[in-house]
């Protein structure tokens, strides 16, 4: 055995440390975070080369994943497809691939879902970050500009606890926090003042959804228990989605249409 392979020799004689495999697993888990940190801190030409290398690695990984996925799908083989009459026991081998059938099924389900939740406002203007988040300057010389204040109406749940003001990035003013919405039932043609349960989706950005920002076109969840709606099984419906149809920051109230 070569002289420099003393670690391998020791392992052959006495085995691994008891915590070796655990430490190795943890180190591999940390590696992605460490590489990310390294990439963020690098500057100049070294950073360019490192980013290029990481980019190539990611492309290679995606190609490998794609190849593995391709291996599991059955593709149509035109040469083997028999011509003319085919006996019943060979029908399942004919032309159509399993992947294509699955893809068509998924597309069909998506279409059904889209029809089920057809919204009153299919298209709305996207809200930019500049008009929705105001930069708040902090520090002794007002040089720090990492804090943002939400300038639109938002919903904050009852269980929400603020972070310490020193570390709070997004400020949601109390005057812009709304708890109720005027929801119109399209079939009953009646409007109800219902409590908001949460913000399902803000079309402008996922960040606004997590912040609970309510703008025109936002889908919110409202408490419809007092409407007395029931399912086919006879259970009372608790929450239902509604789409906001006005600009709440201008009108001072939230008007929405129930999605039925």
UniProtKB/Swiss-Prot annotation:
Region (Disordered): 20-42
Cellular-component GO terms for this entry: nucleolus; preribosome, large subunit precursor
Alphabetical list of PANTHER family matching this protein: RIBOSOME BIOGENESIS PROTEIN NSA2 HOMOLOG
Pfam families: Ribosomal_S8e (PF01201)
Functional summary from the UniProt entry: Involved in the biogenesis of the 60S ribosomal subunit. May play a part in the quality control of pre-60S particles.
Domain of life: Eukaryota
Phosphothreonine modifications at: 81
Composition skew (Basic and acidic residues), residue ranges: 20-34
InterPro entries membership: NSA2_fam (IPR039411), Ribosomal_Se8/biogenesis_NSA2 (IPR022309)
UniProt organism field: Rattus norvegicus (Rat)
Cross-link (Glycyl lysine isopeptide (Lys-Gly) (interchain with G-Cter in SUMO2)): 80
Protein name stated in the entry: Ribosome biogenesis protein NSA2 homolog
């Amino acid at each position: 055995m070569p002289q420099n392979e003393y670690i391998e020799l020791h392992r052959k004689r006495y085995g691994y440390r008891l915590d070796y495999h655990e430490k190795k697993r943890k180190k591999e888990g940390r590696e992605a975070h460490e590489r990310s940190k390294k990439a963020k801190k690098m500057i100049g030409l070294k950073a360019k080369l490192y980013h290029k290398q990481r980019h190539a690695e990611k492309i290679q990984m995606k190609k490998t994943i794609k190849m593995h996925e391709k291996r599991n799908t059955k593709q149509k083989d035109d040469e083997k497809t028999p011509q003319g009459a085919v006996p019943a026991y060979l029908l399942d081998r004919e032309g159509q691939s399993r992947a294509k059938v699955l893809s068509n099924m998924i597309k069909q389900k998506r279409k059904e879902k889209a029809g089920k939740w057809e919204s009153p406002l299919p298209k709305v203007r996207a809200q930019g970050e500049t008009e929705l988040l105001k930069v708040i300057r902090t520090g002794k010389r007002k040089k720090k500009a990492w804090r943002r204040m939400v300038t639109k109406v938002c919903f904050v749940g009852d269980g929400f606890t603020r972070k310490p003001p020193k570390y709070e990035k997004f400020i949601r003013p109390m005057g812009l926090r709304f708890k109720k919405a005027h929801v119109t039932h399209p079939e009953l043609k009646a409007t109800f003042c219902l409590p908001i349960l949460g913000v399902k989706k803000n079309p402008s950005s996922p960040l606004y959804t997590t912040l609970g920002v309510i703008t025109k076109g936002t889908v919110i969840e409202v408490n419809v228990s007092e409407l007395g709606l029931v399912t086919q099984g006879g259970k009372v419906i608790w929450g239902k989605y509604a789409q906001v149809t006005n600009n709440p920051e201008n009108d001072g109230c939230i008007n929405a249409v129930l999605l039925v």
